[in-house]
Regions:
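Catalytic domains of carbohydrate-active enzymes, especially glycoside hydrolases
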Residues: 1-12, 86-91, 202-208, 261-269
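Generic structural signal for hydrophobic
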Residues: 16, 76, 83-84, 200, ...
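Polysaccharide-binding and catalytic clefts of secreted carbohydrate-active enzymes
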Residues: 57-205, 211-218
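Active-site-adjacent "subsite" loops/lids of carbohydrate-active enzymes
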Residues: 14, 22-86
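Aromatic-lined substrate-binding rim segments of carbohydrate-active enzymes
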Residues: 1-46, 154-178
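Substrate-binding cleft of secreted/luminal carbohydrate-active enzymes
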Residues: 205, 210-223, 227-231, 237-295
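Active-site beta-loop-alpha junctions enriched in small/polar residues
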Residues: 8, 28-30, 94-99, 186-188, ...
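Short beta-strand/loop segments at the ligand-binding rim of alpha/beta enzyme cores
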Residues: 20-24, 174-187, 236-244
Length: 295
């Protein structure tokens, strides 16, 4: 069992260690507003030519970097290694390790007054000068001139691979420091490729936390099982899969949701937005009933 903290307080991390809990530092990866003034050129550009530096998609905090810019991967690797060096930190947890959502979960469309039944130019990244030049060097084509970019597999793979290379650089650095590395990822992983250009099935992390928030997709608890099954099959024993569950979505089907996760091969679960002490006790009783051990 463990806890993830978005920040660092040595006393909290030490208390976790004393209680027999792992303590992991959770930090956003590609979404880095702290670089807005230092490296404005590092930020991703959509197909309309708009940069997340000054016109982010959806919400103001969506300040995503371009993974192809020189210096981005090394900056991120160095940052996570600094975190890994901190006392009592057992590992680092990556989040927002992707491009902005080219397709949002369907339940969120109404929040922005959009219907994403196709890819919209303003949410399709990255078309900065670096990405265009690198893709043209590889293929002889300018991605801005592609008639159907959403169907061009070379262009899709170019962006999937760009994120993977950044993750590989971070992973190598963190593991060299002897620490664990995990990530919050989109469910699937087939959905992750389509929605956020995230090919996490080809990463080499120690654990994955697919965000299987069934309510976001108007799905019932059975969908949790299908998503876990695909995730477990994809990693094929190379890493652990912890089903990320949105507590308000599963509160009324708590045990059913847990069954769907564990019966389909999840090594464990993580909860977002809760649960209360009452449900933590229910969770402990569930684990005892199933004969499942906390790690």
């Amino acid at each position: 069992s463990g806890v993830m903290f978005e920040g660092y307080d040595e006393n909290l991390y030490r208390m976790c260690k004393e209680a027999g809990l792992e303590a992991h530092f959770w930090k956003w990866t590609m979404n880095r507003a702290e670089l807005l003034n230092v490296h404005p050129d590092w930020f991703a550009v959509n197909r309309k030519g708009e940069s997340t530096h000054d016109k982010p998609a959806y919400v103001d905090y969506y300040r995503f970097l371009c993974p192809n810019h020189e210096g981005v991967a090394q900056y991120l690797a160095d940052d996570y290694v600094k975190i890994a060096h901190l006392p009592y930190v057992d590992g680092v947890h990556l989040d927002y390790v992707r491009f902005p959502d080219v397709v949002l979960p369907v339940s969120l469309w109404k929040n922005y007054g959009i219907e994403q039944t196709s890819e919209h130019f303003e949410y399709d990244y990255c078309y900065c000068e670096v990405c265009r030049a690198k893709f043209k060097a590889q293929t002889g084509r300018d991605p801005l001139e592609l008639k159907y970019p959403m169907e061009d597999q070379s262009w899709i793979n170019f962006r999937l691979d760009a994120i993977t290379r950044v993750v590989d650089r971070i992973t190598e650095a963190v593991k060299a420091d002897g620490k664990a590395i995990s990530a919050a990822v989109f469910p699937g992983p087939s959905m992750a490729k389509k929605m956020v250009r995230q090919d996490w099935g080809n990463w080499t992390l120690d654990a994955y936390f697919p965000m299987i928030y069934n309510g976001f997709y108007y799905e019932g608890p059975e969908w949790i099982g299908r998503s876990v099954q695909e995730s477990v099959k994809t990693v094929d024993g190379r890493a652990k899969v912890y089903a990320g569950l949105m507590f308000p979505d599963i509160k009324n089907d708590f045990e059913k949701a847990l069954d769907e996760a564990f019966d389909n091969g999840a090594s464990g679960v993580s909860f977002f937005d809760g649960p209360s002490d009452e449900y933590l006790h229910k969770f402990k009783a569930y684990l005892d009933k199933k004969g499942l051990k906390t790690e």
